[in-house]
Amino acid sequence: MVHPHLSRTKRTFFSHSSQMISRHIRKTNSLAFVRALSASETAVTPRRKRTVFTDELNKGPSFEDFVSGKAADVFVDPLEAARKDPEAKLPKWLKVPIPKGRSFHSVKKDVRELKLATVCEEAKCPNISECWGGKKSEATATIMLLGDTCTRGCRFCSVKTSRTPAKPDPMEPENTAEAISRWGLGYVVLTTVDRDDLADGGAAHLAETVRLIKQKAPQILVEVLGGDFRGDLTSCDTLAVSGLDVYAHNLETVEALTPHVRDRRATYRQSLSILERAKQAKPSLITKTSLMLGFGETDEQIMQTLRDLRGIGCDVVTFGQYMRPTKRHMKVVEYVRPEKFDYWKEVALEMGFLYVASGPLVRSSYKAGEAFIENVLRKRKHNVGDSPRLA
């Protein structure tokens, strides 16, 4: 502010000087602000989005790999390679024969006519030709109940998910039982998605289906692969005493990896409690579980899992290779060789498991109607006695 008692000339001089100084200060501050803003933008501005080409390039060997001659040693996922190039060769242990044969096509035709939804086809199971390829009375099919939408989202599974799936069809137990009784199979597996939206997790629906199958065709052996019912042991009891022959519930993986592999609502100990309760509810039941290998588990972790299973009296265990359904799912850490699967089969049998199926392409319902299990079940029904177990 210019003092009022100064002469007009001096006031004018001071006024112009003040304005020039103010402009200089503003200019200096503006430049400093611009420089600071530019520096901050440079620090926080994200890099240009990588192109598909860059992503693909980064998956392969680096420049140093080519210089050192190690480019040929860079691992390429055989399943990913096969998806991109149909001519790419898979390891021999991941190859399966093309489904064919009179029995296979007969079972497939029956599935269509009876309007049954089988996991065998929908999940593109690699063992379908084995399970459907023999005599119809020896064939095994896995029927999906309670819809095709799960309320959980495990990182290995490609089944559709939703918090509010469609309500169960009240006629499904009757229709399924009627269809299966007319089919002529000797062994059937019923499975289901997790239904956390239902008060009992769908236990009553499954139990009613089993009861009606046994009513219409008592000779059919029934296995149910169920969920954990959120740990509700009452729901477990409902299913265990429904008349089924094999109660299956999958652990999927070892305890340390469970939080990373399965939905957060599924816990290792909760699954063990379900298998244990099923045996307590009906001691004559065969209890069964399945483990996938290839998530990065260690031998000691697998051994501890087998000890835990034997500790609760689990009778049957299967081992199979985890295969990534899509790029949105967990990566495969290791493709386990067939020799390792043979090793775990021997270990499990020595620990006292009644039956073990182990191989890269084995799934939880693989050859569920194996003659050995059928014989054990039929002997129990006639009170001939249980098959001996190894100590």
Curated annotation (Swiss-Prot):
The keyword RNA-binding does not apply. Pathway: Protein modification; protein lipoylation via endogenous pathway; protein N(6)-(lipoyl)lysine from octanoyl-[acyl-carrier-protein]: step 2/2. Residues 135-354 form the Radical SAM core domain. Binds 2 [4Fe-4S] clusters per subunit. One cluster is coordinated with 3 cysteines and an exchangeable S-adenosyl-L-methionine. Keywords: 4Fe-4S, Iron, Iron-sulfur, Metal-binding, Mitochondrion, S-adenosyl-L-methionine, Transferase, Transit peptide. Residues 1-44 form a transit peptide. GO terms for molecular function: 4 iron, 4 sulfur cluster binding; lipoate synthase activity; metal ion binding. The keyword S-adenosyl-L-methionine applies. Pfam families: LIAS_N, Radical_SAM. [4Fe-4S] cluster 1 binds at residues 120, 125, 131, 365. PANTHER family: LIPOYL SYNTHASE, LIPOYL SYNTHASE, MITOCHONDRIAL. This is Lipoyl synthase, mitochondrial.
